[in-house]
Amino acid sequence: MARFRASNILGDPFALATISIAILAWIIAFISSIIANIKMADYPNHAWWAIAYMFCCTIGVTVVVGSDTGLVYGVAVVGYLSAGLVLTSLSVNTLVYKGNSSAQAAAAGFILLSMIIIVWIFYFGSTPQATHRGFIDSFALNKEGGNAYGNGRPISTAFGHRPETTSTSAPQMYTSAQLNGFETSSPISGYPGGAPGSENRSSSQPRFGNPSASNLPANNNGQSQDEVPQPTEYPYRAKAIYSYDANPEDANEISFSKHEILEVSDVSGRWWQARKSSGETGIAPSNYLILL
């Protein structure tokens, strides 16, 4: 499971507000129930079970939000909260009509809990593509893929810049004097030695003194000098929660399917160096993966 970070709650106004209200409502219901149980002989027992159950649900939601795993455990959260809504509703129906003020205060606490549960079910039960969820997540400072919820799936560039792997600058232009014998012997592609009918057209003689293979620098390891060395260790394992198609213009990215298991060398950045079971290596967006 992902690491719990308090900043995921403190930096998310929606999470901070709903969790705070839920804790306050639970405290009101708990203290009022203690007083009502002392003053009343027929205080309903199921209200105590509702208090204990909602304590666990509130802790669970706090952990899920703090670890930013709402997409992973959203279905389970909705299921538990649905049962909690039934318990709090029954407690409200039983206590709100009591003549005791402490029982009515406990009912008020359960009403607040029920309202928060409804909001949570609507949030966690909605898909990431839902408009309201994307709007809520847009205010979060540390939400993974915060601006990606308006699309069919989270895009990897929605939460940060990845390392530059393609050139965006204009190509360097050289003159014939600067090249000094390194021009190609085929001015027109597909016609070795020049265009048809050109003077001294020959595919066997270099026209501009092309360097022979003996003059080229030797490469002992068989790799380009500009190629980034691949890591030798992949200590982490991650599971893909979405399918991803690599950018065809970027040879460093890799494609993978949903639920595929990848080996990861470093998890500190937004883009992870990963290796597939087939041995293919490359970079993968971290918001498409979850550590195992």
From Swiss-Prot:
Residues annotated as transmembrane: 15-35, 47-67, 70-90, 105-125
Record topological domains on the Extracellular side: 36-46, 91-104
Gene3D superfamilies in UniProt: SH3 Domains (2.30.30.40)
InterPro entries, per database record: SH3-like_dom_sf, SH3_domain, Sho1_SH3
Residue ranges with Low complexity bias: 209-222
CDD domains given in the database record: SH3_Sho1p
Superkingdom per UniProt: Eukaryota
Quaternary context: Forms homooligomers.
Identification of the protein by name: High osmolarity signaling protein sho1
Organism: Aspergillus clavatus (strain ATCC 1007 / CBS 513.65 / DSM 816 / NCTC 3887 / NRRL 1 / QM 1276 / 107)
